[in-house]
Amino acid sequence: MTGPGPVLVVGGTGMLGSQVVSRLLTGGKQVRALVRPGSDATRIEALGATIARGDMMEPESLLRAMDGVHAVITSAAGYTHHREGDSPVIDTVGNINLVDAASRAGIRRFVLTSILTCDQTPDVPHFWHKKLAEDRLEELGVPFVALRPGAFLEQITRFGDPFSEGRLMWFGSSSVPLTFVLASDLAGYLAAAVDASGVDGSGSTSAGTSP
């Protein structure tokens, strides 16, 4: 158990993060969401989250957001460029800033959304950057859980009509094994990791079927 204090969700206005916020609130947790200045947070505010304005590129804003917080969950990712302000530096400098702030703030549980096979793919930047974030958590001794999901099924099913046709459309090599996870399932895993026992510093768990 991490304690009675709020959980800070980083990336809480995104597709995955907003579901994490919902799962935590449903489970009776107090939720604080880090939201960039100017970004719309009305959706998660309506759910019951409190908003801390800050930016992963501004370390002092992270410390302010973590004041009184017992756990941090991050689903932030910059490489996708899904929203204004997204940048690959979120995955490098931003993640390191977040981990460093968690260490300084004495966070009792840090839950990282990593990615499957990140430790085997140094030539794939957004995979490898997750591995570097895991390494930084371990280096600083921050109690953490890193979940390594595969691809989101919701993103794959946007192509064609897979349910009526009985097949998925995928762009890539036909010889590379694939693994998928529902974002709603992953949100549940991330929320549950806040209070999971016997996992601090234990490394990473795959969410989904391993290739």
Model-derived features with residue positions:
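Structural signature of the Rossmann-like NAD(P)-dependent dehydrogenase/reductase core
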Residues: 9-10, 74, 109-112, 146, ...
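N-terminal Rossmann NAD(P)H-binding glycine-rich loop of SDR-like oxidoreductase domains
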Residues: 2-29
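Glycine-/Pro-rich loop/turn segments that contact NAD(P) or position catalytic residues
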Residues: 78-165
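Conserved sequence/active-site signature of Rossmann-fold short-chain dehydrogenase/reductase
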Residues: 57, 152, 209-211
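NAD(P)H-binding glycine-rich loop region in Rossmannoid oxidoreductase-like domains
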Residues: 8, 35-97, 101-104, 118-119
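Short beta-strand "acidic-cap" motif of Rossmann-like dinucleotide-binding folds
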Residues: 31-33
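Conserved dinucleotide-binding and phosphotransfer motif residues
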Residues: 27, 47, 140
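Substrate-positioning beta->alpha
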Residues: 171-195, 201-202, 208
